[in-house]
């Protein structure tokens, strides 16, 4: 049976289809990192302070955290091909708008459009892959295809900042927006050539039908919950009491509404009954926090506590990107998840211990090792959490579930940034890094215990 599945995997996923998925999925991570070197020239060119320019990064994160599951739900309602193409078109519009933007307001609008557009790629791609695999009768997840989708994010996270730096240096900051037009065109062309049209609907897509099946109230409450939660995280170490209260109230209202909704935005009842899926979201959030905290905190500590320049400190993140890619490749054709997840969570504990033992008076071996081990966490977490989701989610709900997985990852990455702010505060010290390390190690132990006790993993 396994041999038959292997032979049928190739025609189910031709190269043009895989290339379309790579470009569609890659739009999101490349836009998350490409602009990292642009806030300074933007603030100078538009005569705004640097703090306001960084809103361009926050705007995309907030939009994506909400738009990913929304795009997944839309893929299930109107079809993944339509959503995939619409997302690429939105990215092109956002790129043009940002490239010609005369002020910060237009730039923020551009980033919201880009965030919404890039959020369509991954959930739609997962639904497209699932439907193709189901049609071909594949008994196991198409692990190679899923690993490719995971590696796209890993590679672009690594190359995004230097690529953005080159674009800004040689073509100006507006090129980081204009590049979306070219990538959007390529995505649409590949999609038209390789993605089959969506099936015709039994019902007419009227406004009332659309609103009823999208669950607008559920979406609104979800958006309020996530927005308030991210504001709480981004305001740390100061706790925003108002946003904290809004988060709790909106979450309770969201759960209560979804439990009684005819077509819930998120099937809370099924999610509560499926502990494995819930644990997968939580584990992805924790492990991404453990990996991203190295990306955020280590360069900051190296620059402020060890007095390295930005160019040298950035080199310490290279092992992370290399190991993450190798780790993801190592399990590309292996559908097992239990052992890789246990290694992933154990590596997170090791990352925390390494950070807790690192000193500005010591050698560079420990921070370099911490970066490499964090790459192991990043690579294994991205690939295995995706495989677990593919196995656990019903075909008709995999779009929304894929979006929720991405939301979990966004919360983890923002949590990592907030953790750095809590322990570093106004002065970056060895003690702050040690506090971050201890916290990461404790969270890693919790993730490891949850993985060991999860008997659904294999």
Residue ranges and their predicted role:
Residues 75-82, 145-146, 207-218, 335-338:
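Short, amphipathic, aromatic/basic-enriched membrane-interface segments that mark the entry/exit
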Residues 100, 188, 192-197, 231-235, ...:
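Short hydrophobic alpha-helical membrane-anchoring segments
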Residues 96-97, 166, 227, 231, ...:
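Alpha-helical transmembrane segments of multipass membrane proteins
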Residues 2-199, 422, 426, 436-439:
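Transmembrane-helix bundle of Major Facilitator Superfamily
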Residues 1-13, 201-208, 453-458:
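Intrinsic disorder in cytosolic terminal tails and internal cytosolic loops
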Residues 104, 233-238, 333, 361:
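Membrane-interface helix caps and helix-loop-helix hairpins in membrane proteins
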